[in-house]
Amino acid sequence: MFKLAQRLPKSVSSLGSQLSKNAPNQLAAATTSQLINTPGIRHKSRSSAVPSSLSKSMYDHNEEMKAAMKYMDEIYPEVMGQIEKVPQYEEIKPILVRLREAIDYTVPYGKRFKGVHIVSHFKLLADPKFITPENVKLSGVLGWCAEIIQAYFCMLDDIMDDSDTRRGKPTWYKLPGIGLNAVTDVCLMEMFTFELLKRYFPKHPSYADIHEILRNLLFLTHMGQGYDFTFIDPVTRKINFNDFTEENYTKLCRYKIIFSTFHNTLELTSAMANVYDPKKIKQLDPVLMRIGMMHQSQNDFKDLYRDQGEVLKQAEKSVLGTDIKTGQLTWFAQKALSICNDRQRKIIMDNYGKEDNKNSEAVREVYEELDLKGKFMEFEEESFEWLKKEIPKINNGIPHKVFQDYTYGVFKRRPE
């Protein structure tokens, strides 16, 4: 049985024996300053070349979210301990032990955008009478359910993309003794999420909504992942560049990112607070779309440039431009093809989707000629200003702070 080379940090692994029965009461009633002294899990950077800004907690600006992060750390041992309570545990123990190892290796080290916002915003959306210690605890459980599903999709992506590393360590399926057995592990992670719902939420008034929201998340995000692979022939690796359009990029963002990261997080939080109204959330599509589009396009930017002004070593530069090498539809690819001349288009078509660094560098040179970095910065600023103008117009009962927090998570500044 594979043994994890990298175990959970002490802030989580030691909490099993220290978990306070009063933790839900403390989070429901305490001031945030009482909850932030113990550091949570620090998410690791995806590679040594990731900007230093990403190695810091994205919640340093927000005391409430620091508290939510800490609370998720506190209940982690109990939530993951439910694996040992599966009726078949003793009979097929090695499989379920590996499930726990897969979760420990992949789930706690992300940014926890979904989980932290569910825990923090639950208290913002719920009626004060509904903010009981039990429901605070359930918000943390639901936060972990969302994070398990997030890791599930990341692991599938790693397998399909043949990725070697994620967040600075080997991907789960690349570890010795794992390989394509990881497919079973990700399927078990999905099923374990619904097992957690069945154990913790049967008495929650919005249990059916929560179950359906997660099921719909899986369906829509799988469609997005499938759509991502329609732009390149899986056998010949030939790319259909005519499909590299702004319209298709928007569709890709909607199904692969926006539904799963923003739309679904708001749905789950609303259902957790027992105020779920799909019509209200549908009204917010333009704002959630703009935030999500910016989130994905920033990922595309970081794949090419990392942070503005960052100086990279030569060895680190080789990890840039992965999207070019793998033939991904990105903001930069569709933008370049929409404004380039015939010579530049030929260079892109001749070099895009090829693994050699020389090929990706040729594409990057075209991007430089077209000043795509400058155009991206303009697009980012326009998006921020649009959100700054539109968020105050929301008047359907959902607090503006929800969208300001989402926006800060993407732009690192608040639209106020």
UniProtKB/Swiss-Prot annotation:
Motif (DDXXD motif): 157-161
Binding annotation for Mg(2+) 2: 157, 161
Pathway: Pheromone biosynthesis
Source organism, top-level taxon: Eukaryota
Entry EC no(s): 2.5.1.1
InterPro entries linked to this entry: FPS1-like, Isoprenoid_synthase_dom_sf, Polyprenyl_synt
Residues annotated as binding Mg(2+) 1: 157, 161
UniProt cofactor note: Binds 2 Mg(2+) ions per subunit.
Induction and repression of expression: Specifically induced in the anterior midgut of males. Expression levels are regulated by juvenile hormone III (JH III).
Catalytic activities: isopentenyl diphosphate + dimethylallyl diphosphate = (2E)-geranyl diphosphate + diphosphate
Example of a GO cellular component annotation carried by this entry: cytoplasm
GO molecular function: (2E,6E)-farnesyl diphosphate synthase activity; dimethylallyltranstransferase activity; geranylfarnesyl diphosphate synthase activity; metal ion binding
The protein's required cofactors: Mg(2+)
Expression sites by tissue: Specifically expressed in the anterior midgut of male beetles, the site of aggregation pheromone biosynthesis.
Pfam families per record: polyprenyl_synt
Function per UniProt: Geranyl diphosphate synthase involved in pheromone biosynthesis.
UniProt xrefs under PANTHER family: FARNESYL PYROPHOSPHATE SYNTHASE, FARNESYL-PYROPHOSPHATE SYNTHETASE
UniProt-recorded name of the protein: Geranyl diphosphate synthase
Organism this protein belongs to: Ips pini
Gene (name only): GPPS
